[in-house]
Every structure is written in structure tokens, then in C-alpha cells.
Regions:
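Extracellular/periplasmic carbohydrate-active domains that bind, remodel
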Residues: 1-332
Length: 332
């Protein structure tokens, strides 16, 4: 069966979407504002729900984000296929979720393949409105999946919007990355808000090729101030004037006199492990670990048994690693 349209699940328990059918977004039209939940930019949107299972289906040609759960717990996604090519067509965006398992699935997207965020599309998106803290994120497992990331975005991405107190205990294991085509990266943490991101494990990941773009990255872990930050400029004309692309897209500078204000809204990244990572083919892209300032650092990145073309990475030079405001990096 082919469903042309979209699925919405709200304030529900014990919901299953099963079978071998297709949810097709080809005919979905947008009025241009993807921030609203009921826009057809999302093929499956869930919120404030529990015990949800999605299994066996194919999701095709999403306008933007494909599967987007917000504040969902006990979510299982197994043996699904996502095939997109439009810009911004993220695969699975886990927003403020807990106790999630994603397994045995294939994702081909033209933006982030799988993303962990803390963001609600009900909240006011900028200052001076009161900060809205989303539920914490914990216990996410992604295993046995295959990814193909096209020109935009990243393969595994935590961020940019991380508006909660803590994101912890995330595991990505036994996955294959067929290709990373654009200027993004394979392993990514972009903390653009105030959260503490800790205890993240990438294990037994095979990357066939990660260097098709000249400025692509393998590992990108950073604490940033960007157009996605909650404390960004309120005036959109200022954002357009100042934003720039460097190693990351859509950065904005900290203006003179605003250093303490923006520093107070940055978070932390600590205890991140990459174990048994294989880059099988192509040249090795560079990697970057970048804190925000001396009080908001990247702390404790552990790389254990990473190989490129069969050769083991033994030090920062082998990894082509650049660091700033970063401490306690181990490579063995």
C-alpha cells in the first residue's frame, strides 16, 4: 500500500505503524514555514507519547524532516527505509526523547541522517522570551543501520539545538556509512545551546568513504554560537548581516560587550568515545574538537582502535586533528 500524506501521533500510548507499505511525500505542499508542527514537511510527527513502534515501512521523498518524535519515550524503530533527496530532508530527528531503539534500517538523506535535538516547535525561538527547557534526553540506541548522507548535513549529529539540562547515554553501534558526500561530517556533536552532552559511544562503525567534498570532516565536536542558538540576535536583519560559514555553517560572531552574556548560555561536551571505527576507502578528512571558551570546553574524547585503510590511528597527527578549548584527548 502507498499512503500519500503524513502521519500525526499526539498524546498517545501503545501505537504501532507496521507493514511493508510506503508513506510518500511527493505530493505534499508547503506554505513555506517548516517550523509549524502541522506543516507537511514531516512525514511522521509524534509528540508527548509513549510506547510507539514503527516497523517495516518505507518513507519516500519527504519535503524536510522525515520522522520527528518530540518528547516521546519507549520508541522503537526497526527495519524501515528512508529515501530522500530534497535539501533539508533529515532522516530521523529525535527531539527530547528517552528510551529509544533504532535498528536494522536504511537512511539515504540530503541532510542529517540521524539527529538528536532538544527543541520544541511550540517554544519561542529567540530572546528576550523566557527560556524554555525541554525534557532531558537519555538512553538512545542506534544499531545495525546503514547510512548514505548526500550533499548537506551529517551522518550522526547531536545538535545544533540542545535546549535542555542534559543529554546522556547515547550509543551508536554496528552501523555502516556508505558515503558522506558533502561538507559535513560522519561523527558530529554541535552544542549550540546550554546542555551538558555526556557519555556518548560510537562503536563498531564502518565508513566506506567520507571525503567526497574537499572540506568534509570525519569527527566534528564543537560548542558554538550560531543562528540556531536560543540566545541568537533577535533582529533577523542582524543575523543576515553577520552570519558566516567557516568550518561550520551559519555561525554568528559574539559582538563586543556580549561575551559574558553568550558564554552564560553555552553548555559542555564530555566523555565521548569512538571505538573500533574503520574508514575503509578514500582520503582521511580532517577532524576538529572545539570548545567555546575556557569555561565551556570539550573534555574527554577517547579514540580506541580507529583504522584508516587498515592503518591504525595512533596520534593527533595521524587523525588530522585540530583542537581549541579541548582537554583530555586520548588516542590508542
Amino acid at each position: 500500500a502507498r499512503l500519500k500524506g503524513m502521519v500525526r501521533i499526539r498524546n498517545a500510548k501503545n501505537v504501532k505503524i507496521l507493514g511493508r507499505g510506503i508513506i510518500d511525500g511527493t505530493d505534499n505542499k508547503s506554505n513555506g514555514n517548516g517550523r509549524f508542527k502541522d506543516e507537511p514537511w514531516r512525514l511522521i510527527y509524534m509528540e508527548n507519547s509513549k510506547n510507539i513502534e514503527i516497523k517495516g515501512i518505507t518513507l519516500y521523498n519527504s519535503l524536510k524532516w522525515t520522522v520527528h518524535p518530540y518528547n516521546v519515550s519507549a520508541l522503537q524503530i526497526d527495519n524501515i527505509n528512508i529515501v530522500n533527496w530534497d535539501y533539508g530532508s533529515d532522516g530521523i530527528d529525535l527531539s527530547s526523547c528517552r528510551d529509544v531503539k533504532i535498528s536494522n534500517s536504511f537512511l539515504r538523506t540530503n541532510d542529517d541522517c540521524i539527529v538528536v535535538k532538544a527543541i520544541s516547535f511550540d517554544e519561542k525561538m529567540h530572546y528576550p522570551n523566557p527560556r524554555i527547557q525541554n525534557p532531558n534526553i537519555k538512553n538512545i540506541l542506534v544499531e545495525g543501520c546503514t547510512f548514505w548522507n548526500m550533499e548537506y548535513g551529517n551522518v550522526f549529529d547531536i545538535g545544533f539545538e540542545l535546549r535542555c539540562e542534559k543529554i546522556s547515554d547515547l550509543t551508536f553501534k554496528n552501523c555502516d556509512v556508505l558515503i558522506q558526500e558533502g561538507r559535513g561530517s560522519v561523527f558530529t556533536i554541535h552544542n549550540s545551546d546550554n546542555a551538558i552532552v555526556e557519555n556518548v559511544l560510537f562503536e563498531d562503525i564502518r565508513v566506506e568513504n567520507a571525503d567526497l567534498a574537499s572540506n568534509s570532516k570525519l569527527i566534528d565536536i564543537a560548542i558554538l554560537f550560531s543562528i540556531w542558538s536560543y540566545d541568537k540576535f533577535e533582529d533577523y536583519e542582524m543575523i543576515k548581516k553577520y552570519r558566516y560559514n567557516d568550518s561550520w555553517d551559519n555561525l554568528i560572531p559574539v559582538l563586543p560587550g556580549k561575551e559574558a552574556f553568550h558564554s552564560s548560555h553555552r553548555g559542555h561536551v564530555k566523555n565521548i568515545t569512538l571505538k573500533n571505527i574503520q574508514v575503509l576507502d578514500g582520503k582521511l578528512p580532517y577532524s576538529v574538537f572545539n570548545g567555546f571558551d575556557k569555561d565551556h570546553i570539550v573534555d574527554g574524547i577517547h579514540i580506541d582502535n580507529m583504522t584508516v585503510g587498515g592503518k591504525r590511528i595512533k596520534n593527533k597527527e595521524d587523525l588530522k586533528l585540530y583542537t581549541k578549548f579541548t582537554e583530555n584527548v586520548t588516542i590508542k
